[in-house]
Amino acid sequence: LGDVYKRQHVYIDLIKNDFTGKEFLTTGMRKEVDRCKLAIEEALKGKTVAMISSGDAGVYGMAGIMYQVAAEHPELEIEVVPGITAACSGAAVLGAPLISDFCLISLSDLLTPWEKIEKRLDCASQADFCICLYNPSSFKRHDYLQKACDIMLKNQRPDVPAGIVRNIGRDCENYEITTLQELRDKEVDMFSTVIIGNSQTEVINGKLVTPRGYKL
């Protein structure tokens, strides 16, 4: 267990009651580099520091930037503890939509140009991947899910099954099964995970299922 815990306020609030007596350091959004530098400063003091990352630290998480910022301190030991990313936890809620080949695409253009995101959506839907969308919407990107659906609808049927899981693992968790066409006008936020099936995905007893190819 760590002596010091580093992360945004929202994630610290989720764990602080489980680690009483520990020191917690928090930063705001878009302060990832500063957060890593603070963690290194504490580690250089001889403390064991735990960087808290939602889901899996190696999937849209803090593991990569932590290694980059700590590159000049090879004497520090970094251990990445695997977690459960939203694609896996969300898929479990929806059924079994990611049984076949799938890809993860973030709709956030904060670090990736939208033009590159558009190309990835187009190529992935052309290749008939099941697609899991991270960061589908925010206050400034309220129409990005609509844009993404319009791109995918060029390559997929409008009735391809899709699902939304909101607030995964929290008390207010909820989900809904829909279609790619209907998904376009659904309300989502940064705590939503969206999964679009491929051409073989079906709804079985209210759950999304993508066949692997077994003969029944």
Feature-to-residue mapping (PLM):
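P-loop/Walker A phosphate-binding loop and immediately adjacent motor/lid segment at beta-alpha junctions
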Residues: 10-42, 146-165, 214-215
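Short, small-residue-biased leader/transition segments that mark boundaries at the very start
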Residues: 1-5
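A short acidic, often aromatic-flanked loop/helix-cap motif at beta-alpha or helix-coil junctions
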Residues: 30-35, 86, 110-112, 169-172
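Short, polar loop motifs at secondary-structure junctions
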Residues: 7-13, 198-201
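Glycine-rich phosphate/diphosphate-binding loops that line cofactor/substrate pockets in enzymes
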Residues: 39-47, 122-127
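Class I SAM-dependent methyltransferase SAM-binding "motif I" and its flanking Rossmann-like core
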Residues: 59-127
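General beta-strand structural signal in soluble alpha/beta enzymes
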Residues: 6-8, 26, 51-53, 78-83, ...
